[in-house]
Amino acid sequence: MLKTIQDKARHRTRPLWAWLKLLWQRIDEDNMTTLAGNLAYVSLLSLVPLVAVVFALFAAFPMFSDVSIQLRHFIFANFLPATGDVIQRYIEQFVANSNKMTAVGACGLIVTALLLMYSIDSALNTIWRSKRARPKIYSFAVYWMILTLGPLLAGASLAISAYLLSLRWASDLNTVIDNVLRIFPLLLSWISFWLLYSIVPTIRVPNRDAIVGAFVAALLFEAGKKGFALYITMFPSYQLIYGVLAVIPILFVWVYWTWCIVLLGAEITVTLGEYRKLKQAAEQEEDDEP
């Protein structure tokens, strides 16, 4: 009887092991960690230009002046663990200096910010192994829409949330609202990854695969934030070695780790569909055998 139970358990776990083997094979073939390193490098170069463009958009709309402060604190508190305050202070200084640039310099900032989006597009389509290329004008329109509408939609959502919290009837729902706010970063990460895996690839991505891959990436991202913050707090080796410059390697390691998570979610999304196709092909071969 024990042998029968073991055989059943082995039969049920066999598809999981086959899928994990396929996932590891694709990660190795796509050089996922190298892609993550490239994206981390481009992200660090594009970080200040991207933030400068986003805050310039908020400055163009006076109604978002208060919301931009809330959005800024939300981003640094939830997406840059442990050293968010220090990084925020430095980036705000850099952005303030960039406001003194000429029109040519401002165009350079925008091009650098768009370069990050192009790199993300290229990396994800490499993982999906897509040969189809978008028209350049269409790609530019998509990048520009993300760059402009993304921050405005995020600001609008925070403004609506602040308005709802200010209503009298909301005072009776403080506990519920607190619980929702705790999981809001996870939901935001999940939705962001889902949109990334669904829209950026130039081939059709099954919606359920994108949802699963995005959920795993969101969970890893939230766990990574807490784990990274705990590591920096419990083992302050970077502060001991680099002193006041510790924020630089800490930021680089965190950005690299984040891109590893993003690309791993993409690999999971791709592998789910790939495994399903291989399984269907194997079943078809078995049916065709006499």
From Swiss-Prot:
<dbReference type="Pfam" id="PF03631">
    <property type="entry name" value="Virul_fac_BrkB"/>
</dbReference>
<keyword id="KW-1003">Cell membrane</keyword>
<dbReference type="GO" id="GO:0005886">
    <property type="term" value="C:plasma membrane"/>
</dbReference>
<dbReference type="InterPro" id="IPR017039">
    <property type="entry name" value="Virul_fac_BrkB"/>
</dbReference>
<feature type="transmembrane region" description="Helical">
    <location>
        <begin position="244"/>
        <end position="264"/>
    </location>
</feature>
<feature type="transmembrane region" description="Helical">
    <location>
        <begin position="140"/>
        <end position="160"/>
    </location>
</feature>
<feature type="transmembrane region" description="Helical">
    <location>
        <begin position="210"/>
        <end position="230"/>
    </location>
</feature>
<keyword id="KW-1133">Transmembrane helix</keyword>
<dbReference type="InterPro" id="IPR023679">
    <property type="entry name" value="UPF0761_bac"/>
</dbReference>
<protein>
    <recommendedName>
        <fullName>UPF0761 membrane protein YihY</fullName>
    </recommendedName>
</protein>
<keyword id="KW-0997">Cell inner membrane</keyword>
<keyword id="KW-0472">Membrane</keyword>
<keyword id="KW-0812">Transmembrane</keyword>
<comment type="similarity">
    <text>Belongs to the UPF0761 family.</text>
</comment>
<feature type="transmembrane region" description="Helical">
    <location>
        <begin position="44"/>
        <end position="64"/>
    </location>
</feature>
<feature type="transmembrane region" description="Helical">
    <location>
        <begin position="104"/>
        <end position="124"/>
    </location>
</feature>
<feature type="transmembrane region" description="Helical">
    <location>
        <begin position="183"/>
        <end position="203"/>
    </location>
</feature>
